[in-house]
Each structure stands twice: as C-alpha cells, then as structure tokens.
Amino acid sequence: MGYVRTGILMAVMTALFLGVGALIGGQSGAIIALVIAAGMNLFTFWNSDRAVLSMHGAHEVDPRAAPDLYNMVRGLADRAGMPMPKLYLIETDQPNAFATGRNPENAAVAVTRGLLRALTPEEVAGVVAHELAHIRNRDTLLMTVTATFAGAISMLANFAFFFGGSSNEEGERPMGLVGTLALMFLAPLAAGLVQMAISRSREYEADRIGAEICGRPLWLASALGKIEGLAQRIDNVRAERNPATAHMFIVNPLHAMGHDRLFATHPNTANRIAALRAMAEGAPQASRIPRVAARRGPWS
C-alpha cells in the first residue's frame, strides 16, 4: 500500500510541476518545465550524496579504526542482500543517522558520534538496518527527486509571479488574475505537502523492512525512543543550518516534535514505536546478526 500511495503522490507532484510550467508558457512552458526538471534531477542524481555529506561535515570511517561498527554494518548489508555501503561519521552529540546515494551500489550511511555514544550496539544495529532499508528501497533516490521537484516548482512559481503567466490570443489569462495568483502561491505549498507526505510514508516502510533485516523490531523501537528524546534536547548545528535535509534523518534533527503535522518530515515517533512493537509480537524472532563486542568507547 505504501508504494501505491507513493506513486499517487509522485503523480500529483509531477502534475503540479507541469501545471505551473503551462501557466507560464502554455504547452511549450510545460515541455520546458519538464526539460528543466530532467536536468535538475540528472545533476542531483550524480551529486546529491557528496553534497549532503559535505553539508554535515561527514568523514568516511576507516574500517581499521572501527572494526566492530564496520563488521556490524557489513553483516546487516549481507542479511539485506545488498552491497556494503560506505560508512561515514558526523561529529555531533545529537544521536541520529541518515542514508544517501543514487542506488545500492553507490550509497552511504552516516551516523553521528552521539548515536554511537548514547545507544547500545543492538539499538545501533536497528538504526543501521533502517537506513539500509531506505537504500534497498531506493528511497534515497526518490526523496532526492521529490526535493528537486518541490524546489523547481517554487522556482517556476516565483518566475511566473514576476514575469506573468501565459495568456490566450486576446491577451487574457484563461484562469483570470486571481486564479493565476492563487496557483502561483498554492503550487509551492502543495508541493511541500506532497514531499513531506512521501517522506512520512517511506519512513514507515523503512521501519518495517529495517526490523526484518536486523531481526529484532524492538531494537529499532528502543533506538527511536532514545533518539527522539535526545534530539529534542541536543542541537545539531549543521542540520539547523541545512533544514532542507531534515527529512533524510531517522528522526527529525530540528528538535523533533511528537505530532503528525502536514509539514512534518517524519511520522509521529510514538506511532512508529507502536507499529514496531506490534510487529515484534506477531513475528518470530530471526537469528541474531554478528554480535558487536562491548565497547569502551564509540570506536573500541
């Protein structure tokens, strides 16, 4: 059902984009808008992962410096039937994580130092499994495309506002001035709503598949509870500077709230935990992943 809903929302996003393009230049405007979107998506397809990792100051983890963490991620990737992603560390005390990359063969998982300090090895495994689920589902690519579409819609709407929309042969706007202005203001708003709805839908799906990958839904449920509580108290300075990337994290890094809202980047954490607990009660426990040895610190 999640995939059907995502497909419908993507169709709405595309229709909004073409509609704004048509408003600016009629049929030709819609075609030009489509070409612009293709160009923007092609650029982000190849560059978005490097850009977002740089925004958050992430640096690649040396397997020799963190063998336990590296082996855990590799074991989970093997269980998921996917290549081992690159592993990155973000120097912030807020516990959090995200995945990025255009496909499973070119993907990365970034975890914060705060995550490694605050969570147990089992909880870290649950978080990593969630991020691997995003990669396997190609959510990382999907969210890049939706973010690009939303940004392009806002750009086109601003262009239409300053330069005017298309007119008919008599020089009149078919929708009328009020209708044209309404579309220019409402289209970016609607695009943002659709983008966030897709993001929330994919989080639930990644929770479910991530729990299957690690074999213990309660590991992820426990991790979400801890991250939610700490994210409200600990700042993530780089995330605050780059709020457009908030939807990528496992929990909203911008002092996440506990309510489902139209513009919420994530579902209500309590609802996610409840779904995972229900999953744990109804499913047999899978075999354990390779055990992470007890650590004296985040890298030992």
Swiss-Prot record:
Ligand binding (Zn(2+)): 130, 134, 203
Membrane topology: Multi-pass membrane protein
Subcellular location: Cell inner membrane
Main location: membrane
Key words of the record: Cell inner membrane, Cell membrane, Hydrolase, Membrane, Metal-binding, Metalloprotease, Protease, Transmembrane, Transmembrane helix, Zinc
GO biological process, one term: proteolysis
Protein name: Protease HtpX homolog
Native organism: Cereibacter sphaeroides (strain ATCC 17023 / DSM 158 / JCM 6121 / CCUG 31486 / LMG 2827 / NBRC 12203 / NCIMB 8253 / ATH 2.4.1.)
Gene that encodes the chain: htpX
